[in-house]
Amino acid sequence: MASAAFEIDILLPSDLSPADLSALQKCEGKLVFLTALRRRVMLSSVTLSSYYVNGAPPDTLSLMAAFRRRFPAIIQRVLPNKMIAAALGVAPLPPGAFIQNTGPFDLCNGDSVCALPPILDVEDKLRLGSVGEEILFPLTVPLAQARELIARLVARAVQALTPNAQAQRGAEVMFYNGRKYNVTPDLRHRDAVNGVARSLVLNMIFAMNEGSLVLLSLIPNLLTLGTQDGFVNAIIQMGSATREVGQLVHQQPVPQPQDGARRFCVYDALMSWISVASRLGDVVGGKPLVRICTFEGQATISRGEKAPVIQTLL
């Protein structure tokens, strides 16, 4: 017999107004991310203020990292005193589990769905004025489109750093399921979208630059293995750019170990770069949470509609 679903009671404040409660009831099927996996939690554990770091609001990269670190759950029911959410990844989903499409793309039967912060002009934020809280719901996006969307955003942000850069025709258009979507982020003003793109680009450029410098410092040492390693010898004989770099750029020899047993600095730098690049890839790569599974009815779910889901097999 299958184990029961892990349901979480998100307790609502007693002074929540009827209007705010009615707005919350329209959020059934949306995703929230919990700071801790408990049977009963407070509303403050899923509000926007829970993502703040040292009192500063989060940018998109920190939200992506939080989505990977926290525990995802789907709001199944909203009652006068609590919201009942089903946790993902710890137990089977309850029968009839569903999600609400909050992203810009249509969801199709069989799509693996991941969560993204609002990186475009599409934002799903609910303000509860009676208790002074805000809930920022993530965008539900198919996995392939989420990765392409992040790649396009980073490419546009890099292009915007070039003075007098002109956007290429069709660079901000995505096609999915027979429809055309305009994915134009506003990179001209220092608003939330601009800050998001800049933080993402700076982290990526830093990782690529550090990795290139570390590998460049190792090239002369690698080329000395040409007489012993057939693969390296083949690269040298090809007269490639790698060979030119090894001949023209004379790096300083690797220093002796510091403090006795300490490792070489260049290898420490390489290790740190691999760690940073791997972590950045995990954050921006997207993680499938659920999979759309419709047995009857329409196979395409538009924004604001609900769709039955099953757990992903990843």
From Swiss-Prot:
Entry GO MF terms: structural molecule activity
Keywords, in A-Z order: Capsid protein, Host nucleus, Virion
Entry's localization field: Virion; Host nucleus
GO cellular component: a single term: host cell nucleus
Cross-referenced Pfam families: Herpes_V23
Entries under InterPro entries matching the protein: Herpes_capsid_2 (IPR002690)
Major subcellular site: virion
UniProt keyword Plastid, yes or no: no
Oligomeric and partner information: Interacts with TRX1 and major capisd protein/MCP.
Membership in a protein family: Belongs to the herpesviridae TRX2 protein family.
Annotated function: Structural component of the T=16 icosahedral capsid. The capsid is composed of pentamers and hexamers of major capsid protein/MCP, which are linked together by heterotrimers called triplexes. These triplexes are formed by a single molecule of triplex protein 1/TRX1 and two copies of triplex protein 2/TRX2. Additionally, TRX1 is required for efficient transport of TRX2 to the nucleus, which is the site of capsid assembly.
UniProt protein name: Triplex capsid protein 2
Organism: Equine herpesvirus 1 (strain Ab4p) (EHV-1)
Name of the gene this protein is made from: TRX2
